[in-house]
């Protein structure tokens, strides 16, 4: 099992309930694929360094997980498809 840090940015025009449901959905994707979520940090709404898909702001989420690569690959695949996530990155943490 490896440690990963996932950072994703949610589009700013979502209401709180929809944003929370999105976070839960993606956390469940990780859990269903055998990942153990060790920490979830909500950085809140922040200004982007540059415009992404005509948005100047976004809600930042940081998720630390311990999992096999399969779970992170599925998260990555679904995040690419989702219109609600405007940017994401997955980083493998060093041991």
From Swiss-Prot:
Q: Which UniProt keywords apply?
A: Ribonucleoprotein, Ribosomal protein, RNA-binding, rRNA-binding
Q: Which InterPro entries match?
A: Ribosomal_bS6, Ribosomal_bS6_sf, Ribosomal_S6_plastid/chlpt, Transl_elong_EF1B/ribsomal_bS6
One GO CC annotation, please? ribosome
Tell me one GO biological process term.
translation
Disulfide partners: none
Q: Which GO molecular function annotation, any one, does this entry have? A: small ribosomal subunit rRNA binding
- Similarity-based family: Belongs to the bacterial ribosomal protein bS6 family.
**What role does this protein play?**
Binds together with bS18 to 16S ribosomal RNA.
Protein name per the record? Small ribosomal subunit protein bS6
> Native species of this protein?
Geobacillus kaustophilus (strain HTA426)
